[in-house]
Structures are given as C-alpha cells and as structure tokens.
C-alpha cells in the first residue's frame, strides 16, 4: 500500500567510481611454439597437471626435450603423441595460477578518470559476501582499447585466470554531503517543504549511495522536508 513519507535530508559519504567487468589473468603464462615441422615422440605432462620449473614437457623426433620455464599448470595441450607440429603453431600452454592480476577495458571517457594507485573494489558473482580489494597498477592503450591493470591484494584460491569479476574503481570520495532518498525523485524533480511552503524543485544529481543520492550545490537545505509517495 502506498503511503506519503516525509523525511529530512541526511549527511553522509559518497564514492564516485567507474564500474566495469574485468578478467583475471595470470602474471606468468607461456605458449610453446616450434620453428620447424616436428613430430611429438612423447608427452611428459597432461592438461591440468602442475609442474615444477625445468620439468620435462615433451620430447620431439629430433631428440629435443622441452622443459617448463617456471612452475605452473598445463592449461592446454594442442597435440597428441605421434602428431606432426607445423612451425609457429601453439603446442602447449603453461600458466602460473598463483600469481594473477585483473584486466579491465574502458571507454575513453572513463579511462580519462583513471590514475595509478586508485583503490578498486572487486566482486565475484559466486562469492558476493567476500570484500576483495585491489589497486590500479597501470593504464595503457592496446588495439584501440584502453586497458587497466589491477593488482588484487589477495584472491581466494578458487579464483582462476579467465574468470570474470565486477570492478569498481574509486575516482573520488566525498564526505558530509547532502543525501536524499532516490525514491523521492520524479522526472528530475523533488517535492519539498521549506519554511511551511510546499515547493517542487528541479535538481541535479550527484553520486549514488545505496538508496540515497547526493544533491550537490546547496539545492536542498538541511532543514528541508522531503515529501514523496513510498511504494
């Protein structure tokens, strides 16, 4: 049942942020490619297997054994034993799952607001209850995109490279600002009682803070009474 609500504005804090979907990436990844037609004589590893640095990966018909350049996990084997590998084609992929970062792609307008060391809030769909944080490491152009590299403080062990994450990059935090309920705003206007007089005023909105929104520039006074229909 709808009811008329009257409430005074409150003071609070708001955070202006850039929101984007990011992807977890490994700090160390390696793709083995060969430079000549070669037959795989033997595989020493399988997909999903953890290997140590310098562990043997595969043996070719030239008698060459290729080894792991670092400790990690085999994430892809593209060929089986006895198959011929053509030059420059990926043979296997090795990834360090323990050291990761996050890559976010932004449009130009959002990218202009990003600076190194800005705080970032991270949220994974399956573990929304966990508060995860990071910082902006760098921003750079790549292939017509503007990419942001985020270094997380820590990530749960179940988070793997190529998983997606919601990111909120903190641009600015403002304290002691005037906030009014979002529900009180209709078509960019709000109805107020000011010194025993009812008024409907057009307002400019600032940042959101849950169900409240910032009203900058003194448009709403602390003693105003906000009148609206609560559904």
Spans of features found by a protein language model:
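Short conserved beta-strand and strand-loop elements enriched in small hydrophobics
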Residues: 117-125, 167-169, 188-194
């Amino acid at each position: 049942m709808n009811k008329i609500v009257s409430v005074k504005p409150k003071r609070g804090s708001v955070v202006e942020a850039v929101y984007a979907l990011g992807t977890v990436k490994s700090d160390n990844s390696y793709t083995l490619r060969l430079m000549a037609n070669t037959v795989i004589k033997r595989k020493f590893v399988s997909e999903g297997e953890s290997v140590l640095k310098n562990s043997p990966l595969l043996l070719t018909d030239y008698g060459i054994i290729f080894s792991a350049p670092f400790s990690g996990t085999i994430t892809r084997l593209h060929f089986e034993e006895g198959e011929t590998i053509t030059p420059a084609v990926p043979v296997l992929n090795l990834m360090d799952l323990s050291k990761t970062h996050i890559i976010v792609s932004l449009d130009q307008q959002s990218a202009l607001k990003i600076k190194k060391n800005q705080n970032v809030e991270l949220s994974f769909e399956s573990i929304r209850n966990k508060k995860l944080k990071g910082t902006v490491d760098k921003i750079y152009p790549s292939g017509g995109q503007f990419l942001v590299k985020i270094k997380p403080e820590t990530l749960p062990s179940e988070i793997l490279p190529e998983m997606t994450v919601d990111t909120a990059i903190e641009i600015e935090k403002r304290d002691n600002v005037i906030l009014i309920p979002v529900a009180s705003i209709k078509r960019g206007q709000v109805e107020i009682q000011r010194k025993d007089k009812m008024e409907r005023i057009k307002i400019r909105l600032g940042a959101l803070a849950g169900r409240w929104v910032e009203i900058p520039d003194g448009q709403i006074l602390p003693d105003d009474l906000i009148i609206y229909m609560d559904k």
